[in-house]
A protein has these predicted regions:
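Amphipathic alpha-helical segments in well-structured domains
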Residues: 98-99, 138-142, 175, 324, ...
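Active-site loop/turn elements of alpha/beta-hydrolase fold enzymes
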Residues: 85, 157, 276
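A short, aliphatic-rich alpha-helical micro-motif
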Residues: 115-119, 172, 302-303, 357-358
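N-terminal small/polar loop signature for handling phosphorylated ligands or for N-terminal nucleophile
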Residues: 68-146, 281-293, 299-300
């Protein structure tokens, strides 16, 4: 897992290197420019003579990075020009210093974007500190750059992207490549910022973590899947976890089937489904590996299991509400982990007094619509800051929040937060969330064995989200995103674990 930073944290880390360690800001700027130039040359070296590079620079230190990039590339034999945006009177000391050096190196400055047919555009207008909408001449320039038929590279972050939320601040530069410094910024992980960034390379420029900045944001990576423990050789089906799936209203057995299938796909030992009598025959036919209970001896069921899944396809009737409340309260009293999903969340939104049953061992998995019902906010409001939304709900309830979206955010009650970059548009299909619920339950079950180091529930949930995303990516390779179904993700999960 790699640390992600907010704009405020990046500023503090940058300041620590300058003020506490004593590295001059001009040295850090030179390192940053060298890294950008290296990435450009890695792609452009074979066509140096044909390249026409334009570095578009603002008045701040991000602009200074861009000016230094232009100078380095010119000295390496590339035809490079500068285009300056913004008020010259507002230039930072470092930006002006870089302009003076560039002038001494005879880097040309152009006054018109159409002076040449540029093959590469370097965006260094705004850095990560931008929080206001892009307006006026800045907007006009970014709009013109986006229309150019050229390879586009952003310095640290595409201009116009909020570095914390990924929001588009009026207009944003559309990069093919973003070279960001020291740490990936949160806004490069979340849409639409992730889309505007293109491929992201995190460059080491000599800025490192500091005790003065306590990390709380993390990006899960494919290699993290190795943290999931293997099955022990002397185990049995009881050792590998018993999951109770409380799901499926009469005639609605698909969600229960997919949740149970997701759990089996990641190695769970036993699954029992508590569901309506009408679902007995189809579930026994589709998933004979699962046990079924269509009665009402809930206490026996709860005593049997290790982990409870509550909600998929259960409905929001009075009878469903009674069942969900009973299991939430009883699981809380028994200190058993719970995955609360779908209609379980919709019923929680209708009965906020049930939040008293939520603990740090409960994982809620709302999509944006369910999150809106839980928080009273519109989807548009939630999308302005997904990280804050997930963290606030986790802090309020004391439970883990897995906020499902194109980039899923997992937040623990203590504030630690994980973002998954795995997954693809093909996973936006009916039943995908039910599969995730089963996978999450299965992952939590992996850590029940006391021979395995036990991470907190938030970290376990983040690993489950990663596994789900990787399974979807594997399914997309085989099926394509257009034809994927939830069952393909189930099969993908087993393959991911097989090859880890």
């Amino acid at each position: 897992m790699k640390q992600i930073v907010t704009c405020k944290e990046m500023k503090a880390l940058d300041g620590n290197m300058i003020e506490e360690i004593g590295i001059p800001s001009c040295v850090l700027m030179e390192r940053a420019a060298l890294k950008v130039a290296e990435e450009l040359e890695r792609t452009l070296a074979d066509k140096k003579q044909e390249e026409r590079i334009l570095c578009v620079c603002g008045s701040g230190n991000n602009g200074g990075d861009g000016v230094a990039v232009a100078r380095i590339l010119k000295l390496h034999g590339y035809r490079t020009s500068l285009y300056l945006v913004g008020n010259p009177d507002h230039r930072t000391v470092e930006m002006q210093r870089q302009l003076d050096i560039a002038a001494a190196c005879q880097v040309p400055v152009v006054n018109n974007l159409e002076t040449e047919e540029y093959t590469t555009i370097v965006d260094a207008i705004f850095g990560v500190g931008l929080s206001r909408p892009v307006e006026g001449s800045y907007r006009d320039v970014i709009m013109a750059l986006n229309q150019l038929n050229a390879w586009k590279v952003a310095v640290d972050i595409p201009s116009g992207v909020n570095g914390d939320t990924g929001a588009e601040l009026g207009i944003a530069f559309h990069a093919d490549l973003t070279v960001t410094f020291a740490f990936r910024k949160a806004g490069l992980c979340l849409y639409p910022g992730r889309k505007f960034a293109g491929k992201v390379i995190v460059a080491d420029v000599g800025i490192y973590a500091s005790d003065k900045v306590k990390p709380y944001l993390w990006q899960t990576e494919k290699t993290d899947i190795h943290f999931l423990p293997d099955k022990i050789v002397d185990g049995n089906k009881g050792t590998f976890g018993k999951i109770l799936v409380v799901a499926g209203s009469p005639g609605m057995c698909g969600a229960a089937y997919l949740s149970a299938s997701g759990a089996f796909a990641v190695g769970i030992g036993m699954v029992k489904i508590v569901t309506a009598e009408e679902n007995r025959i189809p579930l026994q036919t589709m998933l004979p590996e699962a046990m079924l209970d269509c009665g009402d001896d809930f206490a026996k069921d709860l005593d049997w299991c290790d982990i409870v899944v509550i909600g998929p396809g259960i409905g929001t009737t009075y009878q469903a509400a009674e069942k969900v409340q009973w299991f939430l309260e009883a699981a809380s009293g028994a200190a058993k982990p719970v995955i609360l999903d779908a209609d379980g969340l919709n019923l929680l939104a209708q009965h906020p007094e049930w939040k008293q049953y939520l603990t740090s061992r409960v994982v809620m998995t709302p999509h944006m619509g369910e999150m809106g019902r839980l928080t009273g906010k519109t989807v548009k409001e939630l999308q302005t800051d997904r990280i804050a939304a997930a963290r606030e709900l986790a802090a309020e309830t004391g439970a883990v929040c897995v906020l499902k979206d194109a980039c899923t955010v997992t937040a623990a009650p203590d504030g630690n937060t994980w973002i998954s970059l795995a997954g693809n548009p093909g996973m936006a299909t009916a039943g995908s969330g039910d599969v995730l619920t089963g996978i999450l339950a299965g992952v939590l079950a992996m850590f029940l064995n006391k021979r395995t180091e036990l991470p907190d529930t938030g970290r376990q949930a983040a690993l489950g989200v990663l596994l789900h995303g990787m399974a979807g990516d594997l399914a997309a390779k085989e099926k394509g995103t257009a034809g994927m179904k939830a069952g393909d993700i189930v099969r993908g999960a087993s393959e991911v674990l097989k090859n880890k």
